[in-house]
């Protein structure tokens, strides 16, 4: 019988099997470990060991004035990161300003694991407040302070103090699975539209790039107005911001106004939304006044969801260039769900079989497993487990506060999804 030698597993392999929260601690042990962990080889090795693991995420509301930062539902404790608590709990207390009231932190947007927050740091005069902006990864407690945008009104004697409501959204560039840069988009003025010229609307924005560390002004043209100052954050995917618009007095779904902030084009693309009550027909038809809609993403797809009288439909943007939508779900929901006050919130960031809804009549959050047509009612701060042992946290009281005045329109909540690797926050050159 052949006798074999006992094989020892290299230290690097042992380390790569740990969750990212544990690996992050080893980076500070010594320069050698830091160099090993930040290498491409180690990142690929970690990915091979955790290929079937999920990552943590939260469905977030964009913070409204005098409200606290709120998530509707979140999953944590996954094997990739092994977090003991929800993602939003890592944002506050904010390490840069730990003693500020929670109502003075504004969640603006998220993209590929990075979040943008504005912090109200002081009152200047005449009820004008001073804000600071930060982009970072709250779990790693790694933040980059963003300089203030330049004053667009150079001849104005009064300085320009951008408010959190001028923040439109954030986009990122991913190379080889790692976030290499980000851009932040602010509107120049609250009216958003400066003028209408030859049938085209002019949208003036100020864009910050982590590649240069500078804000630059940009003019973008669109055949429909860009309402970037709405309560919700625009949906972002692959460098593109998707914003919503609809003609006044219309009950139809409206259109998406999309722009690629990493592209060279200065034109927005207008994409008609599918669903009940076409924009140009039955504009005063009350039959569809209780249609509830949301725009979300799942995987690499933009998803549009519509609920009317317990019938849920979901479409995938099949081809952005041709503006084609593909119907992927049509499901009749059970009778215990409200027939007129059920609002779709979002789709699972990784699974198009799972959707999340808010039942305003009963004040509860509902998850729907569409393939099995099973719907589950969740209670406040419920802790549940998935097949992988992920922890679920539901915030019904916070969601109720944000949803109590919702009626029509297209809801767009922000998906804060941790990456499958602990990318460093892109920083501008010195």
Curated annotation (Swiss-Prot):
Signal peptide bounds: none
Family matches, as Gene3D superfamilies: 1.20.1280.50
Ranges of residues in domain F-box: 1-45
Protein name: F-box protein At1g49990
Organism this protein belongs to: Arabidopsis thaliana
Pfam family, one: F-box
Superkingdom of origin organism: Eukaryota
Classification of source organism: Eukaryota, Viridiplantae, Streptophyta, Embryophyta, Tracheophyta
InterPro entries per record: At3g26010-like_b-prop (IPR056592), F-box-like_dom_sf (IPR036047), F-box_dom (IPR001810), SCF_F-box_component (IPR050796)
């Amino acid at each position: 019988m052949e006798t074999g030698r006992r094989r020892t597993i290299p230290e690097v392999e042992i380390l790569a099997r740990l969750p990212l929260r544990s690996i992050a601690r080893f980076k500070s042990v010594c320069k050698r470990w830091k160099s090993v962990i930040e290498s491409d080889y180690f990142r690929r090795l970690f990915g091979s060991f955790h290929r079937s693991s999920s990552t943590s995420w939260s469905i977030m509301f964009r913070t409204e004035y005098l409200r606290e930062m709120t998530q509707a539902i979140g999953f944590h404790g996954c094997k990739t990161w092994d977090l003991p608590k929800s993602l939003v709990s890592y944002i506050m207390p904010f390490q840069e300003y730990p003693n500020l009231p929670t109502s003075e932190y504004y969640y603006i947007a998220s993209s590929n694991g990075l979040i943008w927050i504005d912090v109200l740091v002081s009152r200047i005069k005449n009820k004008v407040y001073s804000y600071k902006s930060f982009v970072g990864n709250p779990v790693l407690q790694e933040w980059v302070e963003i300089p203030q945008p330049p004053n667009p009104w150079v001849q104005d004697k009064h300085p320009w103090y951008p408010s959190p409501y001028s923040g439109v959204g954030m986009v990122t560039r991913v190379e080889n699975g790692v976030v290499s840069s980000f851009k932040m988009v602010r509107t120049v003025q609250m009216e958003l539209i400066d003028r209408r010229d030859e049938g085209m609307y002019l949208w003036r924005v100020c864009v910050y790039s982590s590649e240069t560390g500078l804000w630059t002004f940009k003019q973008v043209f669109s055949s429909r107005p860009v309402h970037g100052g709405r309560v919700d954050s625009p949906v972002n995917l692959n460098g593109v911001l998707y914003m919503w618009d609809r003609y006044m007095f219309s009950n139809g779904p409206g259109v998406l106004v999309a722009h690629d902030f990493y592209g060279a084009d200065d034109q927005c693309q207008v994409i008609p939304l599918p669903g009940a009550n076409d924009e140009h027909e039955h504009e005063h038809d009350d039959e569809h006044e209780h249609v509830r809609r949301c725009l979300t993403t799942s995987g690499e797809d933009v998803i549009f969801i519509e609920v009317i009288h317990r019938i849920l439909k979901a479409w995938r943007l099949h081809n952005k260039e041709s503006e084609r939508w593909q119907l992927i779900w049509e499901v009749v929901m059970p009778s215990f769900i409200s027939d007129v006050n059920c609002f779709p919130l979002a789709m699972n960031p990784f699974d198009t079989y799972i959707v999340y809804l808010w039942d305003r009549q009963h004040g509860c959050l509902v998850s729907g497993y569409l393939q099995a047509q099973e719907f589950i009612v969740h209670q406040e701060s419920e802790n549940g487990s998935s097949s992988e042992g992920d922890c679920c946290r539901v915030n019904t009281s916070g969601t109720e506060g944000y949803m109590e005045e919702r009626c029509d329109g297209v809801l767009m909540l922000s998906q804060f999804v941790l990456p499958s690797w602990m990318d460093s926050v892109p920083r501008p050159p010195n």
